[in-house]
A protein has these predicted regions:
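Conserved functional hotspots at enzyme active or ligand-binding sites that engage polyanionic ligands
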Residues: 1-104
């Protein structure tokens, strides 16, 4: 069963028509949809990963099988599970970043 925090290979070429501004190719994606959705729905919410470093503060670095990856939260998407291929890894946590500015 697919679980939140799993990293799967997803075929984004088939999931989205060409010409749209989405990540392309078959790439690893973190499953972020909740367990009820993952069990009963035909779609999954995912966030794609890339190995390309671009130094944006919102792109959080994670290591999967000793390979540096970056989470692309601005690319969160819902995909049909038929485009979700094989499991690559499981993260023991979901990445959340909160920032709070002190008001002086």
């Amino acid at each position: 069963m697919i679980k939140r925090g799993d990293v799967y290979w997803v075929d984004l070429n088939k999931a989205f028509p060409e010409g749209l501004h989405y990540q392309r190719n078959i790439r690893p994606c973190v499953i972020i949809s909740n367990e009820k959705n993952n069990k009963f729905c035909d779609t999954l919410t995912v966030v794609p990963l890339t190995t390309k470093r671009d130094h944006l503060s919102i792109h959080k670095r994670i290591f999967i099988n000793n390979t540096e990856n970056f989470v692309l939260p601005e690319q969160i998407m819902t995909v049909d599970r038929k485009y979700v291929l094989s499991k690559l890894y499981h993260l023991n946590f979901i990445l959340c970043t909160f920032s709070r500015k002190n008001k002086s």
